[in-house]
């Protein structure tokens, strides 16, 4: 009995305690379940946003999904709570106690569910409205766009690199062009291309009109000349034989024209280049020299003396051209318009007298006139140097004379000159400006071929002094001696009196490989108008298509302080054979100045839109030379 009562007392004592502990456990379990459910929902939502940012979720479906999860969480919490009470082995709870515990725990559960719902529902309610996800999605799209732009930029960069590599391939022998090009250069090229197009159209139309009359006059004059030489011959083929044997003499008579031609019939193209501009008289050929020698002491001539250094033999003697009536005349009157070169330094009056018996040639230098005044040249003292070519062993010079029209009247005699050697010799005249403390400076020169010389008696000639020569090498490449010379006082030979800037260019094209080789050999009369010193110059080459778009570009290295710079740089362009007649080569010479913008000295265009007839003839000669280099001087046009 006592035990029964004691057990009841113990049971009554522990029953409230166990019920309180069970309620506390239930509350903690429910709170933990609600918290875990909310964390699971948050993790699901975050994973859904991170894995599928571009997926368009419907607001109602999202809200329904969250509500179903909430209901499952709320339904699962009481089941778990009831299972806790069923697992109590040591304590038996009455229905009332269980109900009380459930009623006690239900406010806590409701509070926890309310707390969880207060945290979770804002997410689905805010996601459909897209205030926050939109910035996230837009930033991702922007990143994709940015990455795509970066990819495009990398592709564009590779294209630019290929173009740079293309330039390096083009400029295989010279310095490469700078990576960044100024808009001024592009504007200059566009302007020059338009000018060259207009100039090309103008001179081509003029040539087409004069072509027929020139060809007719040439045939008539040639026939008249040949008939004069063959008066005693009755054979029908005499004229043809004379045409072949006296080709040198006939071309020499025509050598006064402005275009350089080749006397020796090396190719059919050169013979086709012989043209007339006036009456076919030997006197004119005498005054106009066969070649225009350069200022460096090496003979550069495209006629009787080729660039190979007098290696070719002369099959004919031009003295047979002179008729008795012409030999009687001692003074030659030459039209002034035929004596005007591209640029002029003055006139030199000389008298030639050759005696075959004594084998002596006496050259009397009478006077010079039309020289630049002191304001333009800086000097007022003059001296003439003469030399007998090709040996250069016999030389002479006059005394120094002053004034704008110095009178010399001095004689120079060349001895041991046999009659058979007269036709293969020439006399070179050079006019120097004499200075006291500095080295003399050459102002102009002229070459007179002795094949025009009278066999007996005196012959008065007025020579037009020119500042620069013009050379055409025909089918033979340029002799190294032409550019390996040592210019006398090259740093002081800038013709401040107004010599025209010129550029010696070599062209060759290989039809098999499609390689167009352009060699910038040397320049002449590059002046620095802004300073009293020789300029620092470099050249730029542009290859343009038929509409003026740039295909390739390159440039030379800088030549510092040289009025007559020697470049000797070759650039190779890849041009297909069918494109050769549609491209234009633009060459521009610039003067580089410190702390100032560059200044263009001049430019020239060759090809489809050549800047002149000389340039067009050079281009055509290159196409017919079959891979051999052809070299010519070109006068630069002002910018």
From Swiss-Prot:
Q: In which tissues is it expressed?
A: Highly expressed in heart and testis. Moderately expressed in kidney.
Biased composition regions of type Low complexity, renumbered to the chain: 476-496
Any one GO MF term held by the record is: identical protein binding
Q: Where is the composition biased (Basic and acidic residues)?
A: 142-151
Q: Which family does it belong to?
A: Belongs to the synaptotagmin family.
Identify the coding gene: Syt16
Name this polypeptide is given: Synaptotagmin-16
KW Transferase (keyword) present: no
Function summary: May be involved in the trafficking and exocytosis of secretory vesicles in non-neuronal tissues. Is Ca(2+)-independent.
Q: Which intervals carry biased composition (Acidic residues)?
A: 174-187
Renumbered to this chain, the Polar residues biased-composition regions fall at 95-119
Location of the C2 domain: 344-463, 499-634
Pro residues bias spans: 121-134
Enumerate the UniProt keywords alphabetically: Repeat
Any one of the GO CC terms: membrane
Q: Pfam families recorded for this chain? A: C2
Describe the subunit structure: Homodimer. Can also form heterodimers.
| Segments of this protein annotated with the region Disordered | 95-191, 470-496
């Amino acid at each position: 009995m006592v035990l029964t009562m004691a057990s009841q007392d113990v049971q009554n004592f522990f029953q409230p305690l166990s019920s309180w502990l069970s309620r506390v456990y239930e509350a903690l379990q429910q709170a933990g379940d609600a918290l875990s459910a909310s964390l699971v929902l948050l993790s699901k939502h975050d994973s859904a946003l991170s894995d599928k940012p571009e997926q368009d979720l419907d607001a109602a479906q999202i809200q329904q999904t969250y509500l179903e999860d909430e209901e499952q969480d709320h339904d699962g919490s009481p089941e778990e709570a009831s299972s806790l009470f069923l697992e109590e082995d040591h304590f038996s709870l009455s229905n009332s106690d269980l109900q009380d515990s459930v009623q006690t725990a239900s406010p806590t559960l409701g509070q926890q569910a309310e707390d969880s719902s207060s945290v979770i529902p804002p997410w689905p309610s805010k996601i459909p409205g897209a205030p926050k996800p939109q910035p996230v999605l837009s930033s991702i799209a922007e990143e994709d766009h940015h990455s795509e732009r970066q990819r495009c930029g990398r592709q564009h960069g590779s294209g630019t690199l290929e173009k740079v590599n293309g330039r390096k391939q083009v400029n295989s022998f010279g310095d490469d062009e700078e990576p960044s090009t100024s808009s001024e250069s592009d504007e200059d090229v566009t302007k020059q291309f338009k000018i060259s197009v207009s100039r090309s159209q103008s001179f081509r139309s003029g040539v087409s009109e004069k072509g027929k009359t020139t060809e007719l006059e040439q045939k008539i004059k040639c026939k008249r000349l040949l008939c004069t030489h063959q008066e005693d011959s009755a054979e029908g083929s005499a004229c043809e034989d004379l045409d072949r044997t006296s080709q040198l003499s006939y071309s020499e008579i025509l050598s006064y024209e402005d275009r350089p031609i080749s006397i020796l019939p090396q190719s059919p193209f050169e013979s086709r280049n012989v043209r007339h501009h006036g009456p076919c008289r030997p006197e004119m050929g005498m005054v106009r020299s066969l070649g225009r020698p350069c200022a460096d002491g090496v003979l550069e001539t495209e006629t009787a003396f080729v660039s190979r250094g007098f290696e070719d033999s002369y099959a004919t003697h031009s003295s047979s051209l002179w008729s008795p009536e012409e030999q009687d005349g001692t003074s030659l009157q030459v039209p002034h318009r035929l004596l005007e070169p591209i640029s002029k330094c003055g006139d030199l009056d000389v008298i030639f007298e050759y005696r075959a018996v004594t084998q002596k040639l006496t050259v009397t230098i009478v006077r010079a006139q039309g020289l630049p005044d002191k304001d333009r040249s800086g000097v007022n003292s003059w001296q003439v140097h003469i030399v007998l070519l090709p040996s250069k062993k016999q030389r002479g010079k006059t005394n120094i004379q002053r004034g704008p029209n110095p009178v010399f009247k001095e004689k120079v005699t060349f001895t041991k000159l046999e009659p058979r050697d007269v036709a293969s010799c020439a006399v070179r005249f050079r006019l120097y400006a004499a200075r006291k403390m500095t080295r003399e400076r050459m102002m102009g020169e002229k070459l007179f071929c002795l094949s025009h010389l009278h066999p007996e008696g005196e012959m008065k000639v007025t020579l037009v002094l020119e500042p620069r020569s013009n050379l055409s090498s025909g089918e033979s490449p340029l002799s190294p001696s032409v550019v390996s010379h040592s210019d006398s006082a090259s740093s002081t030979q800038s013709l401040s009196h107004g010599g025209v800037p010129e550029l010696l260019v070599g062209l060759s094209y290989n039809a098999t490989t499609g390689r167009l080789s352009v060699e910038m050999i040397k320049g002449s009369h590059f002046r620095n108008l802004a300073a009293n010193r020789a300029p620092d110059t470099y050249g730029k080459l542009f290859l343009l298509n038929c509409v003026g778009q740039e295909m390739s570009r390159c440039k030379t290295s800088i030549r510092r302080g040289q009025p007559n710079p020697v470049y000797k740089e070759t650039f190779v362009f890849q041009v297909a054979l069918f494109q050769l007649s549609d491209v234009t080569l633009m060459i521009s010479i610039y003067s580089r100045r410190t702390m100032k913008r560059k200044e263009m000295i001049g430019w020239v265009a060759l090809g489809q839109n050549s800047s002149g007839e000389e340039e067009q003839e050079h281009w055509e000669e290159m196409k017919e030379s079959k891979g051999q280099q052809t070299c010519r001087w070109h006068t630069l046009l002002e910018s």
